């Protein structure tokens, strides 16, 4: 018996709608990353993008355990000496609630062109409205 390898044109992609209201950030991100990679499918092939599309709503209502809202920092650097900036999770959720989920999921995907292709299938929205109604996303409970 030969080992099965999925072909890119044969992969069927579904759309899922995830409500992030009251869900812990890390648990949400790990399940989303698993679905984006396609590891939940029997046809999973490591070098082929077999994942599904994910739409996340209510990103502003995620939870963090412990004191992470005040103590978890996100860093960026301008490239100039002394140009390091930091932002707490609390401030990040005020400014751009989608970004917290995007950063958590991006860190759990491969750091290569295939991982970037997987990340493009993620759509995160701060509120409860989204423009993907035509795709008829199925609700996914996490």
Curated annotation (Swiss-Prot):
Task: List this protein's GO terms for biological process.
Answer: negative regulation of translation; translation
Q: Name one Pfam family in it.
A: Ribosomal_L13
- Indicate whether Cytoplasm appears among the record's keywords: no
Which molecular-function annotations from GO does this UniProt entry contain?
Answer: mRNA binding; structural constituent of ribosome
Disulfide bridge map? none
Q: Does the keyword Ribonucleoprotein apply?
A: yes
What is a single cellular component term in the Gene Ontology annotation?
cytosolic large ribosomal subunit
Alphabetical keyword list: Ribonucleoprotein, Ribosomal protein
How does the annotation summarize its subunit structure? Part of the 50S ribosomal subunit.
Question: Which family, according to the similarity comment?
Answer: Belongs to the universal ribosomal protein uL13 family.
What's its job?
A: This protein is one of the early assembly proteins of the 50S ribosomal subunit, although it is not seen to bind rRNA by itself. It is important during the early stages of 50S assembly.
- Return the protein name: Large ribosomal subunit protein uL13
